[in-house]
Structures are given as C-alpha cells and as structure tokens.
Amino acid sequence: GEGFFDIHLHTCFPRLPNITRSNGTYYPSPEVLIQMMNSAGIAKAVVLSTLSPECRYTIVTPEETLQICNKYPDRLVPFCNFDPRYLTNSTKANFLPLLTAYKEAGFKGVGEYIPNIYLDDPLNMNFFGQVEEAGLPLTFHLAPQTGGYYGCVDDPGLPRLEKVLKSFPKLIFLGHSQVFWSEIGILKNPDERKGYPRGPIGREGRVVELMRKYPNLHGDLSAGSGFNAISRDPEFGYR
C-alpha cells in the first residue's frame, strides 16, 4: 500500500486532566494519533509500551497497547515490554512464558526498552537472551549516564552495544536516541552524545561500523536524533 510505516509511536487512553509531563505535554489519545498519522501520510505504525519508570509521567502497559491496536488493526502494530526487574528482580527471572503469551496475543516486538542501567547489566543480559529465544525484535533507547535520563547506558564508542550484539546474534536490535545516532560519525567530544551533532560526516562512526559488522543491528529513524543523523550530511545519510 501507499504511505509510510512509522516504527516508533506512543499513545494511551486519556489520563486525568492534570496528569501530564511538567511542561504540560502528554501522549495523544488513539483517535488523535490516527488523525496525526493521516495528516502525515503514515499508513501503519508500531505502538510502543513503556513500563520502566525513568522520566515517565504515566505507564503504558502492553495490555493497554493491545487494546488500542485492536481498535485500529489495519493501522497499528503492538509492541509489548518489560522492565528487567520484573518477576524476581534478579538474573534468574524467567520472562519466556510471558513473552510467549504476548507473542501469541499478537505482539510483534518489544519496546521501547528504557531502563536506566548499563546496557550489558546482567539483568539486561538475562532479558535479552529470552527475547532472542522468543523471536521478537527489540527497540531500545540509549542514555549517556545513569540519572537524569531514560534508556540503557553505554559509553562513547558504544562498547557495551557491541558486547550485546555479539552475545545475541539472532536478536534484532532497533537502535534509537541521540546517544545512538550521534555516533553515525566520529564524535568530536563525548558531549556530542547528548545532542544533535551538525555538519558533514568525514569518517564513518561506530553505528555504521557496528551495522556492517552485526546484521542484527538496525536503526530506528524516529524523532530528532534519527532525522538529524540522516539529514546532517544528506549524501552520506542516503548512501
């Protein structure tokens, strides 16, 4: 069909009137989301669930996401989610029965995965192994540090991401956020990871290198970070 497929959207049923972010913004209702998609020429979209508390003003459970997607089955695709501290808050937690149940209910992936712990934290490694076994892709958000951010933490050069990609070769990872996309080029300084670096890309950065080396790493182009990565040097971006 015609139109775009957007792999990263958030929505929820309306909350109480004053339940918003501190700046007054909030997720669109399903009806408003569909209107936004129509006006942007988006045919289908993935709706993400968010369960980790970091930087949230509300939690969107997989069940709520599924309910919304079932109202618009030809337009919306549901992703489920967990926090790695679920069940036992240990590296022995068995997520597989729950992941399997969600997959059977029609969920097509996991995300947006945002716990603000190191990407290769043993809790994450336990969870990733089970997502790989369940055969679902995972959309993750990267953060530059613990505290003040949401998303899993990696260092400049993304060494932890490489370790994770190597450990779970059958798990499709969809990378997202400034910390991820700023490394489409070589970082001039570590602070660039927190923003939207501008200008032409001389040498290929770590994201490009990791994508070439690990076929299980894909890019989520949503939001300013993905758009900036592709558009800051159009010739490089489209290549």
Regions found by a protein language model. Give the residues of each.
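An N-terminally biased module of ancient metal coordination in phosphate/nucleic-acid-related enzymes
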Residues: 1-63
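Alpha-helical scaffolding within the catalytic cores
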Residues: 26-34, 57-68, 93-97, 157-162, ...
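Active-site gating/metal-coordination segments in enzymes
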Residues: 44, 52-156
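Active-site neighborhood of phospho(di)ester-bond hydrolases with catalytic His/Asp-centered motifs
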Residues: 4-7, 46-49, 79-81, 111, ...
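N-terminal cationic-hydrophobic initiation segments that often serve targeting/anchoring roles
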Residues: 37, 69-73, 103, 165-166, ...
